[in-house]
């Protein structure tokens, strides 16, 4: 597997942690959000990594809790005129690309993703220009501008299948931005992949030594790992997959104890799926190591109840997602290819 671009390790400034709300304040904002959703003909589309109270509210109001692929499907098909996307910025952009006629609101437009930040479009365009004979495949965790340069967009839930398909056609591939997922896919498929060197600040922090210690403490536990994790963590897994695939694995595996190496936001839906099983966070610190994200995306945490209420009430430049029309049309092509390919897999 070739690697051409190795940016300096970036230390992204984390946003301040949201101020905790009192029980009364939470109740107030929950009721306000429910009322505003009805008034605005809006629906919530929330990612698995948002806080449990946000996922619960999405459930209660007829919204969607899912991975980024299903978020894209749900938002495009739902009849609501407004989508409230609880996630990070690229998810709001993707919703606007697929549903330009709808108003796309986010609790904050400052909710970033380290994979998106780690793949600036100018550098990525130069990288692609240097390898014009490669098919460009980018992860969903990228900006609209990077998607517009791509031949395909992909999510982790269909990454192996898509790359296997392209490899069967004899295509050489540029993969961006996640190096760990890229290496995992290359190992699974044997494809010729030229890999960008980005990483998720959450998954990159899982620690092998500390996980080994935890495994020794819970000998009968299964280890579930998202493929954005380092190879050494993936090698320890009993199941590897996207968020939705890990929830499915939790139901299928016979183990009573499950050690989960992904953002702890997934525990809300995973525990619903396996109420009789015990879920443990894979360690991001220990054995002398420390963590910054500590198994929860700091930008996902920005999707609080107060911010959601303000987005629905205020709209405006602080909350509404806009994508340049020419850019949107270009980014729509690889996104539609992804959705069409995913539909063939669903059969």
Curated annotation (Swiss-Prot):
The answer to whether the entry has keyword Metal-binding is yes
Function according to Swiss-Prot or TrEMBL: Catalyzes the condensation of iminoaspartate with dihydroxyacetone phosphate to form quinolinate.
Signal peptide range: none
Q: Which Pfam family, giving just one, matches this sequence? A: NadA
Q: What's the main place this protein lives?
A: cytoplasm
Q: Where in the cell is it found?
A: Cytoplasm
Q: Which Gene3D superfamilies match?
A: NadA-like
Task: Write out the pathway annotation from the protein's UniProt entry.
Answer: Cofactor biosynthesis; NAD(+) biosynthesis; quinolinate from iminoaspartate: step 1/1
Residues the record lists as binding iminosuccinate: 47, 68, 139-141, 156, 226-228, 243
Please provide, alphabetically and separated by semicolons, the GO molecular function terms listed in this UniProt record: 4 iron, 4 sulfur cluster binding; metal ion binding; quinolinate synthetase A activity
Q: Indicate the enzyme's highest-level EC class.
A: transferase
Catalytic activity, as annotated: iminosuccinate + dihydroxyacetone phosphate = quinolinate + phosphate + 2 H2O + H(+)
Q: What species is given as this protein's source? A: Shigella dysenteriae serotype 1 (strain Sd197)
The protein depicted here goes by the name Quinolinate synthase
Q: How is the cofactor bound?
A: Binds 1 [4Fe-4S] cluster per subunit.
Q: Which GO terms describe its cellular component?
A: cytosol
């Amino acid at each position: 597997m070739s690697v051409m671009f190795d940016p300096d390790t970036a230390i992204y400034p984390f946003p301040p942690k949201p101020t905790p709300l009192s029980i009364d304040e939470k109740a107030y904002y929950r009721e306000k959000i429910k009322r505003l959703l009805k008034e605005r003909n809006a629906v919530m589309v929330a990612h698995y990594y948002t806080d449990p109270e946000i996922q619960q509210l999405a459930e209660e109001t007829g919204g969607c809790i899912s991975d980024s692929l299903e978020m894209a499907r749900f938002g495009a098909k739902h009849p609501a005129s407004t989508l409230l996307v609880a996630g990070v910025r690229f998810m709001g952009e993707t919703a606007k690309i697929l549903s330009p006629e709808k108003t796309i609101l986010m609790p904050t437009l400052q909710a970033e993703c380290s994979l998106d930040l780690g793949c600036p479009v100018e550098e990525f365009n130069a990288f692609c220009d240097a390898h014009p004979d490669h098919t460009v495949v980018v992860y969903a965790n990228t900006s609209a501008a990077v998607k517009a340069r791509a031949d395909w967009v992909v999510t982790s839930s269909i990454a192996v299948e898509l790359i296997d398909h392209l490899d069967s056609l004899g295509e050489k591939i540029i993969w961006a931005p996640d190096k760990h997922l890229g290496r995992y896919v290359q190992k699974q498929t044997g494809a010729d992949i030229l890999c960008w060197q980005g990483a998720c600040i959450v998954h990159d922090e899982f620690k092998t030594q500390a996980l080994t210690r935890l495994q020794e403490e819970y000998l009968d536990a299964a280890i579930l790992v998202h493929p954005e994790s380092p190879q050494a963590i993936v090698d320890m897994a009993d199941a590897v997959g996207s968020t939705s695939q890990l929830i499915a694995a939790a139901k299928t595996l016979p183990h009573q104890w499950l050690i989960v190496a992904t953002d702890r936001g997934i525990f809300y839906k995973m525990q619903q799926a396996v109420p009789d099983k015990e879920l443990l966070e894979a360690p991001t610190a220990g054995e002398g190591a420390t963590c910054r994200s500590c198994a929860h995306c700091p930008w996902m945490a920005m999707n609080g109840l107060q911010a959601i209420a303000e987005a629905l009430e205020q709209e405006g430049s602080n909350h509404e997602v806009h994508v340049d029309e020419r850019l949107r049309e270009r980014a729509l092509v690889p996104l539609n290819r992804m959705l069409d390919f995913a539909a063939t897999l669903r059969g």
